[in-house]
Amino acid sequence: MRRAPHRFTGCAARASAACALIAACACSTRDPYDDLLWYYRPEPGSVIIPREQHGPRSLSMFHGTDGAPIDWNGLWNGIRWADIVIVGEQHDDTNAHEVQQAIWEETVAAWPGSAVSLEMLERDEQATVDAYLAGEIDAETFVERTGSRDWASKGTWDDFYQPVIDEAKQAKAPVIAANAPRDYVRRARTEGYDALAALPEAERAMFALPAKDPPASYRARFRDFMSGGGEREVDEARVDEVLRSQRMWDATMADSIVRAHERLPSHAKVVHLVGQFHSEYDGGLVSEIQARAPFARVLTVTVQKGTARALREEDRGKADVVVYGVAPRLRWTGFQAGLKPPAEERPAEEEAPAWGFAY
């Protein structure tokens, strides 16, 4: 005789499905704002500290997928969730550097032992970085030895990147020279990965080769960048050659980040500063991190030029958090405060440094 189904079977199935959903959220490594239980329920013993929001902390910010507005405290929740925080910049954008400095300042204060990693420094410069952190050389010598003074544009290092390194020095925190030396980047283009893989071990320590192919959209974006948005013809073989260099940048930075993450205390975080092309749309850098550390939780932040009161459609999907560079200002009309319309935007500069790719 056929047994009638137990009347609680449906409830049990729903409960099982709910548990599976919660487990899936808990295991998410890409979007902290999908983890609703985590986001709305503080950890036991934690406290909520209101932050005064001014300067870079007051800028307009939105969730990069659905456009929901967030504030600095919401961004901070994402940082708290993450193991690795990637902050993408346009190299000449002052607002982006102020956001990076604020994120690093608060991260290293909240989680001592965290590390800051920079695209702008190369592995063969790590000894110079360490000498500066140890007080063996002064800032002027550090900048001279690394040739960094004009890295983003003439005379910008002192304002854009040195404050981050000085904050790390004061906090006794590691600074990671994450990138591959430019000679090896060039050789990736001219000689290919097989030739680099055959180099002696001491040289191979200066770079990492890609662990996986990037998303197909990454090459398409790179081709578009090389063609100036389709304004000029580009040779497809040339695109692939230059993309080899770009991918080795991504792989070496990812390898540096993951190595730092693995040797830091369990509570500590890695904050990586990088040109936004590398990290947007989960591009080459993020895919290389995931290939090397699939269980590391990665938060991506991108800072865009210009003002916005909502997520711009062209920025959807670029990062977990999209920040716009100028906060709307209040103006008074009678007894009501209203938002002052943003000034007319100037198109963002898209020129690359002479030695490579910018964004």
Locate the predicted segments by residue:
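Bacterial N-terminal signal peptides that target proteins for export
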Residues: 2-16
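C-terminal motif of bacterial Sec signal peptides marking the signal peptidase cleavage site
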Residues: 23-26
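N- or domain-start disorder-to-order transition segments that initiate the globular core
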Residues: 28-82
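C-terminal regions of proteins
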Residues: 35-50, 252-255, 261-264, 268, ...
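Acidic/histidine-rich, surface-exposed loop or edge segments in extracytoplasmic proteins
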Residues: 57, 80-90, 141-148, 236
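Zymogen propeptides
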Residues: 67-68, 72-109
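Solvent-exposed loop/turn segments at secondary-structure junctions
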Residues: 90-93, 121-125, 181-185, 276-279, ...
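A substrate-binding/cap region within the structured catalytic cores of diverse enzymes
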Residues: 110, 115, 122, 126-260
